[in-house]
């Protein structure tokens, strides 16, 4: 899509100094399983669905992460669980209902502040401002901070020469997650019959299969741990200075130099 960017330059005003403050806020609401647009099975429904697949002798994909009911069933077949242990752990999973949206997203308020001062006389005027913006995404610990400053000066050096100076600077920092983690997609697609924490309140890790490769390889995985230790931190800054001289040589001839 085509777009137009409009850049507006603030100029000082004639008169005594005027100080102004602007505040803007934005509220973002996180998704929830109760939202009408989200239709995801709860733990009991997911376990029932898995049981139906097993009863129909469904062949699960070989590259599938064996978690939830399928993971317990594999342990039962491998004699790692007794029938009683299997039944007890399945019953626990049926009431688990892990709220991935609550763990991975949050309601956020973003805010932007600007303080400016302007003033001057018929011979010279000024405008100065400082600003701060904090933009918070609904994804856990995904945010953007930006500090800005600007100064514009205009003065009549003589009746035929005018000078102006513009200084603008900014400092920004951004924290965001690795794209392959995709917390929102994870919350939509991951079974609620998978715990995020173990019985001791520590992160629960499951064996996740690495994509590709001839031989299957697995690694311990918990998305909360990944988000804590795999974020990107990006910093940047910028400074621009523009000076301009305008010459009114005659009533019909003007010149300028930057």
Where do the PLM segments sit?
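Outer-membrane beta-barrel channels and translocator barrels
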Residues: 14, 110, 121-122, 158-160, ...
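Acidic/polar N-terminal loop/beta-strand segments that form early-domain functional surfaces
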Residues: 129-131, 248-250, 258
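Surface-exposed loop/interface segments of Gram-negative outer-membrane beta-barrel transport/assembly proteins
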Residues: 13-96, 107, 137-144, 148, ...
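A beta-strand signature from Gram-negative outer-membrane beta-barrel systems
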Residues: 1-20, 110-112, 125, 131-133
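An active-site-proximal structural segment forming one wall of the substrate-binding cleft
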Residues: 253
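Residues on the lipid-exposed face of transmembrane beta-strands in outer-membrane beta-barrel proteins
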Residues: 9, 115-121, 149-155, 241-247
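Outer-membrane beta-barrel transmembrane domain signature of Gram-negative proteins
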Residues: 88-118, 122
């Amino acid at each position: 899509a085509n777009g137009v960017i409009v850049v507006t330059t603030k100029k000082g005003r004639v008169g005594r100094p005027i100080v102004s403050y602007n505040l803007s806020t934005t509220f973002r609401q996180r998704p929830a399983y109760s939202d009408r647009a989200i239709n995801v099975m709860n733990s009991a429904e997911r376990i029932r669905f898995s049981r139906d697949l097993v009863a129909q002798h469904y062949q699960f994909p070989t590259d599938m992460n064996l978690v939830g009911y399928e993971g317990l069933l594999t342990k039962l077949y491998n004699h790692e669980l007794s029938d009683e242990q299997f039944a007890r752990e399945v019953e626990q999973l049926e009431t688990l209902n892990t709220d991935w949206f609550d763990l991975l997203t949050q309601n956020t308020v973003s805010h932007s502040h600007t303080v400016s001062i302007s003033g001057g006389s018929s011979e010279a005027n000024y405008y100065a401002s400082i600003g701060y913006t904090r933009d918070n995404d609904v994804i856990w610990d995904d945010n953007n901070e930006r500090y800005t400053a600007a100064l514009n000066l205009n003065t009549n050096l003589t009746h035929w020469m005018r000078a102006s100076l513009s200084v603008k600077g900014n400092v920004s920092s951004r924290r965001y997650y690795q794209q392959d983690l995709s917390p929102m997609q994870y919350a939509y697609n991951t079974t609620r019959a998978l715990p995020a924490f173990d019985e001791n309140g520590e992160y629960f890790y499951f064996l996740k299969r690495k994509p590709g490769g001839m031989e299957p390889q697995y690694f311990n995985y918990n998305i909360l741990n990944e988000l804590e230790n795999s974020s990107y931190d990006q910093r940047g800054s910028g400074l621009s200075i523009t000076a301009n001289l305008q010459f009114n040589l005659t009533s019909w001839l003007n010149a300028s130099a930057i």
